[in-house]
């Protein structure tokens, strides 16, 4: 077994052991429904003060023109 193969085997072994240990500590407990909805919404909407191409993509549901660091007016989520 050469060095690269040995390194890959150790990496896979460490990953498997880490996953098993996380499961014993409750790392893979199922999410509550509210948590899952919050995580999904956060991953699909644009957070506050980020550029917004459309109103419906903002987490707050609205965006307004605000001055950026160059003084230009850009649409950002509220």
Swiss-Prot record:
Subcellular location, record wording: Secreted
Q: Which cysteines are joined by disulfide bonds?
A: 45-59, 52-63, 58-77
Any idea what this protein is called? Answer: Omega-hexatoxin-Hi1a
| Gene Ontology cellular component list | extracellular region
Note what the entry says on domains: The presence of a 'disulfide through disulfide knot' structurally defines this protein as a knottin.
Q: Where is this site: Critical for insecticidal activity?
A: 51, 68, 76
Function noted in UniProt: Inhibits insect, but not mammalian, voltage-gated calcium channels (Cav).
By its UniProt entry, which SUPFAM superfamilies does this protein fall under? omega toxin-like (SSF57059)
* One Pfam family linked to the record: Omega-toxin
State which residues form the propeptide. Answer: 23-42
Q: Which residues form the signal peptide?
A: 1-22
Q: In which tissues is it expressed?
A: Expressed by the venom gland.
Concerning its family, UniProt says: Belongs to the neurotoxin 08 (Shiva) family. 01 (omega toxin) subfamily.
Give the originating organism.
Answer: Hadronyche infensa
Query: A Gene Ontology molecular-function term?
Result: toxin activity
Keyword terms, alphabetized: Calcium channel impairing toxin, Cleavage on pair of basic residues, Disulfide bond, Ion channel impairing toxin, Knottin, Neurotoxin, Secreted, Signal, Toxin, Voltage-gated calcium channel impairing toxin
GO terms (BP aspect): defense response
